[in-house]
Amino acid sequence: MGKGNAKNSGGGDKKSKAKAGDAKDDSKGKMKGAQSVNVRHILCEKFSKKEEALEKIRNGAKFDEVAREYSEDKARQGGSLGWKSKGELELPFEEVAFSLEQSTTGNPKIGEAKTGYGYHIIMVEGRK
């Protein structure tokens, strides 16, 4: 598990350029104070495969369907990792996951991270 790079990018028409670690304190409380997230991811060992998956999502494919096709981990569950608390995930992944806004598989707000496992495309379905 080496150093990783983290970056966020939005899916669909809305692009999220939030930096890992940014905390947004708006009236809905979406970003600040979450201690756990319900997270999905697509894991690809190869950068080129990750880019193909990203392209499908950006062209309107549902996140869970792309996960079943491209992910090398948790593909049968549509990429679902379930609820994860702070400290349970590798730091680059965690920083992105906790900085993302909640979204749906049909209109995901996605982020990217690189860990020792490979390249991750990440989305968050819930926060608490």
UniProtKB/Swiss-Prot annotation:
GO biological process assignments: rRNA processing
One of the record's GO molecular function terms: DNA binding
Reactions performed catalytically: [protein]-peptidylproline (omega=180) = [protein]-peptidylproline (omega=0)
EC number: 5.2.1.8
Segments forming domain PpiC: 34-126
Composition bias, Basic and acidic residues: 12-29
Highest taxon in the source lineage: Eukaryota
UniProt region (Disordered), positions on chain: 1-35
Keyword tags: Isomerase, Rotamase
Cellular component annotations (GO), alphabetically ordered: nucleus
Pfam families according to UniProt: Rotamase_3
InterPro entries per the UniProt record, alphabetical: PIN4, PPIase_dom_sf, PPIase_PpiC
Cross-referenced PANTHER family: PTHR45995
Family, as annotated: Belongs to the PpiC/parvulin rotamase family. PIN4 subfamily.
Job description of the protein: PPIases accelerate the folding of proteins. It catalyzes the cis-trans isomerization of proline imidic peptide bonds in oligopeptides.
Name assigned to this protein: Peptidyl-prolyl cis-trans isomerase pin4
Organism (species): Emericella nidulans (strain FGSC A4 / ATCC 38163 / CBS 112.46 / NRRL 194 / M139) (Aspergillus nidulans)
Gene from which this protein is expressed: pin4
